[in-house]
From Swiss-Prot:
Keywords, comma-separated and alphabetical: ATP-binding, Cell cycle, Cell division, Cell shape, Cell wall biogenesis/degradation, Cytoplasm, Ligase, Nucleotide-binding, Peptidoglycan synthesis
Subcellular locations according to the entry: Cytoplasm
Protein name: UDP-N-acetylmuramate--L-alanine ligase
UniProt GO cellular component terms: cytoplasm
Native source organism of the sequence: Synechococcus sp. (strain ATCC 27144 / PCC 6301 / SAUG 1402/1)
Function field: Cell wall formation.
Length: 478
């Protein structure tokens, strides 16, 4: 007999509660007034927020955490233990959960249980999930529909990566990285695009498509991006959208204008003009994300005037071209891009702000400096050729060593390997092995007028505050 996640009062314990996906689930469960504890070896503003909401946070992973929590909440009722794919069977806390007889669930099991409670919208796809789900959540929130939100990135306008609403909708980001996407069922599913991005889990693109096919079958309605050939040909959906009117999709655009301050376009719905939008985000991929959000919100019955007003106020998710500050004429921006397609799109958007002379940033930059930390050995190895050709818009490139994310190096692969590959296409390429070396190298390379764009899903952005302090101190000394 399969044991289901209990949302009616049984306590929860999260192993790795500080992760961006785990913390979102923990926040919603905590706000549902259920007893929650969790462990994470890294304290952060996210774990601090959970503690303020009432969760008990342990700063190490140990068997005693579960024993203490079990005694505190109720004798004889063991907590439900939630873990992600990153938690291995040899983890001490995981083993303690098994020994104590606690039911252990993958985080996707909890998300699936929450999706069943609401009229749910689940956003899947290789790229654009966080921005699209954040947009939908923000549009519903601005319209007074008070959604519950569980997404994989922090949205300033929503106060973070999760919220418990009183409305009937739940907006969730649906992650395909470990194959658990197949467990999720939703009233509305969205597929933004399909590429091979997790070679550590999938052997080829067909395996990825199979996972998305199961997800598609589990959704009552599927909103599909027809600009992605794989989606268009294999999973066309019940509702379609495209930036190309010639494709004949249900939702499309024309009169598109990309300027430094954002994007303008006219929106069409099944051949009828809805009106013009202004989106304070750049590049075609963000307009595509907005079109997916429009399709979802229109299907839910929202009027276009409310959608247009909401889009104009959406400033994006954190670590998605996020301005972090400036000093001595150098502007620092943080972006989560870690796949060749994402890098190319983000760098193109940054280049546009320089070439157009119109920027979302406080000042129009003069030079684009791309600082990239590759994420995972498996991804770097699988897409080395694609990565090498992704940095064309940059004037200068600095590559750090690979953020392993728990993987072992399969051989002699390093950031230097990638830097050498990029150097075949780019003249001004540099390599620095670790964060300290990155910081010191940037002291030598950066100059007034630069846009220092930090790219990657690892911890590279930890350098940004130190650089801001360095240049601020230099100014004070002067």
């Amino acid at each position: 007999m399969t044991i289901a996640v209990d949302l009616q009062g049984r306590p929860f314990h999260f192993i790795g509660i500080g992760g961006i996906g785990m913390s979102a689930l923990a926040q919603v469960v905590t706000e549902r007034q259920l007893p929650v504890s969790g462990s994470d070896i890294r304290r952060s503003h996210i774990t601090d927020r959970l503690a303020q909401l009432g969760a008990q946070i342990f700063d190490r992973q140990a068997a005693t955490n579960l024993e203490f929590f079990q005694e505190a909440v109720s004798a004889g009722q063991s907590p439900q233990v939630i873990c992600s794919t990153a938690i291995h069977a040899h983890n001490e806390e995981y083993q303690a959960a098994i020994d104590l007889g606690c039911p252990v669930f993958h985080r996707s099991d909890l998300l699936a249980a929450l999706l069943r409670v609401y009229e749910s919208i689940a956003v899947a796809g290789t790229h654009g999930k966080t921005t699209t789900s954040g947009l939908i959540a923000y549009l519903l929130y601005q319209a007074g529909l008070d959604p519950t939100v569980v997404i994989g990135g922090e949205v300033n306008a929503l106060g973070g990566n999760a919220r418990l609403g009183q409305g009937r909708h739940l907006v969730a980001e649906a992650d395909e990285s470990d194959g658990s996407l197949v467990k999720l069922q939703a009233a509305i599913g969205i597929i933004t695009n399909i590429e091979l991005d997790h070679p550590d889990h999938y052997c080829d693109l067909e395996a990825v498509i199979s996972t998305f096919k199961t997800f598609s079958d589990n959704c009552s309605q599927l909103i599909a991006n027809w600009d992605c050939p794989t989606v268009r040909d294999r999973l066309p959906g019940t509702i379609s959208y495209s930036l190309d009117p010639a494709r004949g999709a249900d939702y499309t655009v024309d009169q598109v204008s990309f300027r430094g301050s954002g994007t303008q376009a006219r929106i069409w719905e099944r051949g009828e003009l809805l009106g013009r939008i202004h989106l304070p985000l750049l590049e075609a991929h963000n307009l595509s994300n907005a079109l997916a959000a429009i399709a979802a919100c229109r299907h839910l019955g929202m009027d276009f005037a409310s959608i247009r007003e909401g889009l104009a106020g959406f400033e994006g998710a954190r670590r998605r071209f996020e301005f972090r500050g400036s000093a001595q004429g150098i502007q620092f921006v943080d972006d989560y891009a870690h796949h060749p397609s994402e890098l190319a799109a983000t760098l193109a958007a940054a280049r546009l702000q320089i070439d157009s002379g119109c920027s979302r940033l406080p000042e129009v930059p003069k030079r684009l400096v791309a600082i990239f930390q590759p994420h995972r050995y498996s991804r770097t190895q699988a897409f080395l050729a694609e990565f090498a050709q992704s940095f064309g818009p940059a004037d200068l490139v600095l590559i750090s060593d690979i953020y392993a994310a728990g993987e072992r190096n399969p051989g002699q692969l390093s950031g230097q390997t990638l830097a050498d590959a990029i150097a075949q296409y780019q003249a001004n390429v540099h390599y620095a092995p670790d964060l300290e070396a990155v910081e010191q190298r940037l002291h030598q390379l950066l100059q007034p007028g630069d846009l220092a764009l930090f790219l990657g899903a690892g911890n590279l952005n930890q350098v940004i505050p130190r650089l801001l302090d360095h240049y601020a101190c230099d100014r004070s000394a002067a």
